[in-house]
Amino acid sequence: MTELLYQTDAYLREFDAIVTSVNDDENGILLDRTAFYPGGGGQPNDVGTFIIDGQEVTVTKVKRGNLHIIEGDLPVVGTQVKGVLDWDRRYKLMRTHTAMHILCGVVWRDYEASVTGGNMDILSGRMDFEFERMQKELVQEIEDKINIEVAAERDLNVAILPREEAFQIPDLIRTKINLL
């Protein structure tokens, strides 16, 4: 089981790990621990580099299950690697992710509209909401409310919960339940 370092420290930029498995078919490796986010929920995966035996190797993708797809030759099981995230990309994705949570929170709080879809990229994103009738005037109104929330500089709290427990918190789930 891979220790998911990004769950406890989203600001971690580098880490040391050991190769636990090699996937020849996808040119990927599994590690005992990782700070690379594999993507999910509309958020792209992290990319970056591994330093393996003094050589820099590009991490092009991280898949579910934390399979790190790399360029070049695969190391053997037991090899020590140093992971280095593309921090500029990660930080921009973090900011975008947070902004989308603020958008979702404002729309839920003030209009009781659930999220029906979405996607994000670096400093851009899209969220679909279940509005009975979306009016153009609402766009500026929502933006103004979001800016008030950003200006409030609220503390952000992260909690990793089992799925079943998260579903028991009514104000936490703002996505159409059939999409989860």
Q: Can you describe what each PLM-predicted range is?
A:
Residues 1-180:
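A glycine- and charged-residue-rich anion-binding loop/surface
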